[in-house]
Amino acid sequence: MKEWFKKNKYILIIFIIAIIISIPLFRKDLDVYFDDGIQHIARAYATYLSIQNGENPEVLTSLANGFGYSWDLFYGPFSTILILIGKLITTTFIGGYKFTLIIGMLLSGITIYIFANKLTKSKPTGVLIAVLYMLMPYHLNDM
């Protein structure tokens, strides 16, 4: 166990920092209806209804006044699947959306760490680059 912590200490540091950066998402009064938040939540809800009704979730029949709309033309289904998995964990679509944002922050930090580590051959530099990347205004603004 000690060996595992020693081997993965930099990824654990990134994980802890990603959770600290994501703390504002845990507020209940956080407005997630900005940027693309409302579209992702509405899409996840419509996909959930399609699955519940036994329909093909590629065409969301509850949208466009019942005519259906294929939202997956513009966005892939992976983000919707993550929101629905988050909904299973948190029981709400907003909680599922926040769960997806936290997972995205964590995965982006780990991915940029791996890239920076291969590029610079230095694990501490990789952690620094990962933390700076996670703290970029784009990430913080879109959360």
Could you tell me what each predicted segment is?
Residues V32-Y33, I38, N65-F67, I89, ...:
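Membrane-helix boundary/interfacial segments in multi-pass membrane proteins
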Residues Y48, I83, K87, Y113-T120:
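Membrane-water interface at transmembrane helix exits
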Residues L25-V59:
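Extracytoplasmic loop-helix module adjacent to an early transmembrane segment
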Residues Y45, L63-T91:
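Short hydrophobic/aromatic helix or loop-helix immediately within or flanking a transmembrane segment
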Residues I14-I20, T100-L119, K123-M143:
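Membrane-embedded helix bundles of polyisoprenyl
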